[in-house]
Amino acid sequence: MSRLGFEQFPDYQVPGMKHPDFSPYESNGGSIVAIAGDDFAVIAADTRLSSGYNIHSRTQSKLFKLSPQTVLGSAGCWADTLSLTGSIKVRMQSYEHTHLRTMTTEAVAQMLSIAMYNRRFFPYYVSNILAGIDNEGKGVVYSYDPIGHCEKATYRAGGTAGTLLQPVLDNQIGHKNMNLEDADKIKLTKERAVSVASDTFISAAERDIYTGDSVLINIITKDGIEVRTLTLRQD
């Protein structure tokens, strides 16, 4: 700027340090589907761990067994996923040592909500879905927003392909906007839930580059957790 015939703030064109914008988050992709039945719960997640167009791993599980009847699916920023799940496991171990019993699925759901809310000013960049068996032996699914608000549901999808997966669940599990009599609705069995979860991931892998390679499916019952694997496209 010129004033009184001379430059007030001359630009000497001196090269200096440049500070690019700092981004504390990284999206590593991944998708999750969970379905609750009368006496079971099914939760599935793909195994692709990526960043942009780079694939870091094709075999990384995003399902974390917290107890014999509770499984957490977590996708998003992998560093935040490891930090959150590690913290939850430590708290569960402390509870078990203090009370000499394993936390129920409902208690884990509440604890996870509190842990996420404690980080509300710098939230975990993850999409969490918790599935398990409740005190009455019924399947339950809990979904969360970034600051820990918890919602109990019959089925839920999350992650990078969540918007592609959820409408399929609404149609096949929830029978939304379908003129069906109760007698015409297909009964939700374990195999039906596994089939729908598998089909949703096969479809999502065609449209979402952050979802693929394979799917790990956990079938949770009062007797334990059964694990199945489904291969997806790997491109």
Curated annotation (Swiss-Prot):
This chain belongs to the protein called Proteasome subunit beta type-1
PANTHER family per UniProt:
METALLOPROTEASE TLDD (PTHR32194), PROTEASOME SUBUNIT BETA TYPE-1 (PTHR32194:SF2)
Q: Which organism is it from?
A: Drosophila melanogaster
| Family of the protein in this entry | Belongs to the peptidase T1B family.
Gene Ontology, cellular component aspect: cytosol; nucleoplasm; nucleus; proteasome complex; proteasome core complex; proteasome core complex, beta-subunit complex
Organism superkingdom = Eukaryota
Keywords from UniProt, A to Z, are: Cytoplasm, Nucleus, Proteasome
Q: Lineage, please?
A: Eukaryota, Metazoa, Ecdysozoa, Arthropoda, Hexapoda
Which residue numbers fall in the propeptide?
Answer: 1-20
Gene for this protein? Prosbeta6
Q: What is its main location?
A: cytoplasm
Question: For this chain's UniProt record, which GO biological process terms are given?
Answer: proteasome-mediated ubiquitin-dependent protein catabolic process
Subunit note: The 26S proteasome consists of a 20S proteasome core and two 19S regulatory subunits. The 20S proteasome core is composed of 28 subunits that are arranged in four stacked rings, resulting in a barrel-shaped structure. The two end rings are each formed by seven alpha subunits, and the two central rings are each formed by seven beta subunits. The catalytic chamber with the active sites is on the inside of the barrel.
Q: What does this protein do?
A: Non-catalytic component of the proteasome, a multicatalytic proteinase complex which is characterized by its ability to cleave peptides with Arg, Phe, Tyr, Leu, and Glu adjacent to the leaving group at neutral or slightly basic pH. The proteasome has an ATP-dependent proteolytic activity.
InterPro entries in UniProt:
Ntn_hydrolases_N, Proteasome_bsu_CS, Proteasome_sua/b, Proteasome_suB-type
Subcellular localization: Cytoplasm; Nucleus
